[in-house]
Design a protein with these regions (language model features):
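Short Gly/Thr/Asp-enriched flexible loops that form oxyanion-binding sites at enzyme active sites
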Residues: 63-72
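Active-site-facing substrate-recognition patch
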Residues: 1-50
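Active-site/ligand-binding-proximal alpha/beta "capping" segment
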Residues: 124-135
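Short, well-ordered beta-to-alpha junction loops that form the rim of enzyme active sites
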Residues: 58-59, 131
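Short glycine-rich phosphate-binding loop at a beta-alpha junction
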Residues: 50-58
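Short, glycine/charge-rich flexible loops or terminal/linker lids adjacent to PRPP-binding catalytic cores
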Residues: 74-120
Length: 136
């Protein structure tokens, strides 16, 4: 994780109000090797817990969560911000205040891919207010 710390220090920019701009390697452009390393690190720290699914919010959490899912050999489910017409009826929905967008977003997950018997590992990009994590 030292590489992530170094990347944040060299390329991240604090914008105030708890917002860290990391779009050069995570939120807009992705440093795939770094996100692979981050996901593997999280997977290794939490392996052995019987995880059956990894859950994240679109979009920024997908890259590290995908790496963790590959490492743990489990499916990755990401909460959508808009319900596509192809999604099953009665999806799980929860509102979350976006720290970076400054508005409330609805996170939506199909019940086809998440059940009460799953052991879910929630992995998102950065923790600012924990509102996304709570919604997930």
């Amino acid at each position: 994780m030292q590489r992530l710390k170094d990347k944040i220090l060299s390329e991240g920019k604090y914008l105030g109000k708890g917002i860290l701009k990391v779009d050069s390697f995570m939120n807009h452009q992705i440093d795939a090797h770094l996100m692979k390393e981050v996901g593997e690190e999280f997977a290794n720290r939490f392996k052995g817990l019987g995880t059956t699914r990894i859950l994240t919010a679109e979009t920024s959490g997908i890259a590290p969560a995908l790496s963790a899912a590959l490492t743990l050999d489990v499916p990755l489910v990401f909460a959508r911000k808009n319900k596509p017409v192809t999604m099953a009826d009665n999806p799980y929905k929860e509102a979350a205040q976006s720290h970076t967008h400054g508005k409330t977003l609805e996170l939506i997950v199909s019940p086809e891919y998440l059940s009460s018997s799953d052991r879910v590992f929630i992995l998102d990009d950065f923790l600012a207010s924990a509102k996304t994590i709570k919604a997930l």
